[in-house]
A protein has these predicted regions:
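N-terminal cap/lid segment of alpha/beta-hydrolase-fold proteins
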Residues: 34-71, 312-321
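Alpha/beta-hydrolase-fold serine-hydrolase catalytic core, especially in secreted/extracellular enzymes
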Residues: 35, 46, 240, 244-280, ...
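Short beta-strand element of the alpha/beta-hydrolase
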Residues: 72-83
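Gly/Ser-rich "nucleophile elbow"/oxyanion-hole loop immediately N-terminal to the catalytic nucleophile
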Residues: 69-70, 131-151
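Secretory targeting and sorting signals
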Residues: 1-33
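Primarily recognizes the serine-hydrolase "nucleophile elbow" in alpha/beta-hydrolase
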Residues: 144-206
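Short beta-strand/loop motif that positions the catalytic acidic residue
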Residues: 340, 345-348, 352
Length: 444
């Protein structure tokens, strides 16, 4: 269907406001590039590792680690989140420590904090690839470069691979891509369930916002300029659901609210506050700072099921309709085309409580539609974890990528499982790869 001229103008206007056109966002006014300088390594890294930190010309802090027995491969890492606060010089150390097993196995590692906090997949992808160039310029081009994204960083790395895999001269900037616990449904499909959560939570709790507070559409997260701490949000959830107390201590109203919220949305009790925080502070960032106040979320056609009274829920829940221009702007920034050109492996826990494993089904479909399924391998575990899976599995996925690049043969899940066993002596953690699992496509 032809796009209406007015809609197209609105898309371009939103992109301009969001800073999503061209090179991304403006460089922080106070940013000054800092070349890599020696820095103390985290204690989790092997003895003899050389660590450096610096800042890109666009203001992105970064850390780099080279082990003494470097194997010639560099891992360029894209972190998750997104973090909504101002990036700090040592932010990358958190993921350097989390993935220290990679450095321990002989891989060099580089991670960026990105130039600013908040949402922006293209911005983060640009900063990630800029870090690759910084490392190449200062430490020399490695034998191989692997792009790795974790959680939201999986969206970032997948976008970076689509945008920057091939240099203008036709050479390749990366040899392979590894995406772990990745948010691979993209921007327009990756946050729908959190918009649903805000609506369902408010139906049962009526305290975010409270009746005494200014009303605002729930899709905004918060009004422009407002703030809410995690402690405040947690207190509201506790007040309504008795989340932290024993089931026996909850009032009937609290038990009913918690039961229905979890049943309808599918989130776990342990992650309820975290998901609501994303649907509060991150939504505020997306809507007001990236989309100029426009709404990218919709639940107008959603039928909610699983409650004690679905009829009452669907009649009383707040409804909202997305602005097509906002959806298009978010899609431009964060959706994926599936047009991959590099060997790509994903690793995801079946029961991931933060990023549903259904993201993998969506990504597989996206890649298949682009005709690139031969470049994608997906591996799943039986874990119910997100931020960090079992150590041998990360080492196995890296070894599987090496074998793929060496032989040209895409590894199967069984191949990765067999490799995993060979790394059991690296830690006390198990191999939990499920070789027969394939996720279902989530239509919502």
């Amino acid at each position: 269907m032809p796009r209406r001229p007015g809609t197209m103008r609105a898309v371009l206007s939103i992109l301009a406001v969001a800073g999503l056109t061209g090179a991304g966002v403006l460089t922080p006014a106070s940013a000054q590039a800092v070349d890599p300088e020696p820095a103390p390594c985290p204690a989790s890294l092997p003895e003899g590792t050389n660590c450096s930190s610096g800042r890109s010309v666009d203001g992105a802090w970064y850390w780099v680690a080279y082990p003494r027995d470097w194997n010639g491969t560099l891992i360029v890492h894209a972190h998750g989140g997104p973090r909504t606060g101002e990036p700090q010089p040592n932010d990358p150390v958190e993921d350097l420590d989390r993935f220290s097993m990679m450095v321990g196995e002989g891989y060099a590692w580089a991670g960026s904090a990105y130039r600013r906090g908040g949402y922006g997949v293209r911005m983060a992808a640009r900063d990630t690839d800029d870090l690759r160039q910084i490392v190449w310029d200062h430490f020399g081009k490695p034998r191989r470069t692997i792009l790795h994204g974790q959680s939201w960083g999986g969206n970032v790395a997948a976008k970076a691979a689509e945008l920057y895999a091939v240099a203008p001269d036709g050479s390749r900037n990366y040899d392979g891509v590894i995406l772990t616990s990745g948010l691979l449904a993209g921007g327009t499909r990756g946050y729908t369930f959190r918009a649903d959560l805000r609506a369902v939570y408010q139906f049962y709790c009526q305290n975010h916002p409270r009746p005494t507070e200014a009303r605002y559409p729930l899709w905004q997260g918060l009004p422009e300029g407002a703030s809410m701490s995690r402690a405040d949000l947690s207190a509201r959830v506790e007040e309504c659901t008795g989340l932290s107390i024993s089931p026996e201590a909850r009032t009937p109203a609290q038990a009913m609210a918690l039961r229905n919220i979890l049943s309808v949305t599918g989130v776990t009790a342990d992650t309820l506050v975290a998901h609501l925080a994303w649907a509060t502070n991150l939504f505020q960032d997306i809507v007001w700072k990236r989309l100029g106040g426009a709404n990218p979320f919709s639940n107008s056609g959603t039928t909610y099921v699983g409650s004690d009274n679905d009829v009452a829920l669907n009649q009383g829940v707040e409804r909202f309709e997305a602005d097509p221009a906002a959806v298009a702007a978010l899609a431009y920034d964060a959706d994926l085309t599936g047009n991959i050109v590099l060997p790509t492996l994903t690793l995801h826990a079946r029961y991931d409580p933060t990023v549903s494993v259904s993201h993998e089904a969506i990504y597989a479909q996206t890649v298949a539609t682009a005709g690139r399924s031969d470049l994608l391998g997906q591996v799943f575990t039986t874990e119910a974890l997100h931020s960090r899976l079992s150590t041998p599995q990360y080492l196995a996925i890296l070894a599987a990528m090496k074998n793929w690049l060496d032989t040209g043969q895409r590894p199967s899940a069984s191949d990765v499982a067999a490799l995993c066993v060979t790394f059991l002596d690296r830690s006390a953690e198990p191999c939990l790869i499920d070789t027969g699992f394939r996720p279902r496509l989530d239509t919502r």
